[in-house]
Amino acid sequence: MIEKGFIVVGGGLAGLTAALSLAHKGKDVLLIEKNERCGGLMNSFWRDGFRFEGGARALVNAGLVGPLIKEFGLALEVLPNPITLGIEDKALVIEGEKSLPDYAKLLKGLYPESEAEVDALIGAIRSVIDDMKVLYGVDNPLFAKKKNVLTLAPSVVAWTFKFFRTMYRIAKMDTPFEEALDALSSNQALKDIIGQHFFRKTPVFFALSYFALYGDYVYPKGGVGAFIESLAGEITRRGGQIRYETELVRVDASNKTLTDASGESYRYGSLIWAADLKALYRAADASGLPEKAQAELATRKEAVLSHTGAESVFSVFAAAELPPEPFKKAGSGHVFYTPERAGLGKIHTDELKALMSRWDSVTKDELYAWLRRFCRYNTF
């Protein structure tokens, strides 16, 4: 049996950060990852001489990525990743909050009948951005390079106070963004342009604050995967261990042991599960727990396993043997583009439900006709 003071399960960004933080402090830590490499949704891959981003296309600093790189001394160069919003033949390169007036002008040009509603939406975006600045606009002092307790304490206290005050306000804005947009505008096309690239029922505080995040995007030189490789390499350099292609099938909390698919056992002092939550509950063995704890686990397990993802992401990777100049004319390196100002309307809601309700009788032509309209009016 392998014994470790700390075991982190899941080699995504959360697991890597947790394991590196522990290794940085000299702790005996093992990171277990079921795939052949770490990263999860943060990965890069090569195909025919082109590098593609397999998951997230860039990083959002959010006051964390930059300080993390400095804290752990990662040998990684991070580049600005400006965002372009494109609608039909119009494009706007976002330069943070100061681009809001230009964004309002763009929307009013597209929807002249809804100028007052555009103003209301921009006002709501400004209000949420002000609340979110403490989370995304300031470096977290806990990642300060030199942690002198006396000098760090005032900034931590001030940041913590702002953080909890902001979280309180955010809790009041936890409703789906669709409801908030409905209250601000009756123009479905306008609402679609602002919100249709978010997952259904995304909290309004996140959706409306996203404009501020556009200026916070960064791109690691060498790809998003280079950031992951840097984190993983630093873990092992600092004495931590990583086991790849290791899938856990049993979690025995009463005995603090894990068992993988090959039968290998691991004993831990502390466990951090940064992997799939459903996998944790499927693997959880409650037999050694008190009766009350078993009942609570069973209730929680049923609730977790009954949930499904809101939507899926379909990615198309295109390799173009062209110089950068034509792409520079069209926009920056990261673009949100909507071909038609009309937006999706009911295509992805009522029409999709109607299609699914008679799925057994839907013809191939009907399906492809719906897909063509879905792609024509969507945001990419």
Feature map (PLM): residue ranges:
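Active-site/ligand-binding neighborhood in enzyme catalytic cores
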Residues: 126-238, 245
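A structural preference for short, hydrophobic beta-strand core positions in alpha/beta folds
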Residues: 31, 242-244
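N-terminal glycine-rich phosphate/pyrophosphate-binding loop and immediately adjacent elements
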Residues: 2-137
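A short catalytic or substrate-binding loop motif that flags glycine-/basic-rich loops and adjacent residues
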Residues: 77, 198-201, 308-312
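Generic recognition of stable, solvent-exposed alpha-helical segments in well-folded globular domains
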Residues: 17, 64, 102, 120, ...
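Short, surface-exposed acidic
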Residues: 76-79, 110-122, 185-194, 292-295, ...
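Mid-domain catalytic core of redox enzymes
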Residues: 220, 249-380
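Short loop/edge segments at beta-strand edges and connector loops
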Residues: 10, 80, 228, 244-246
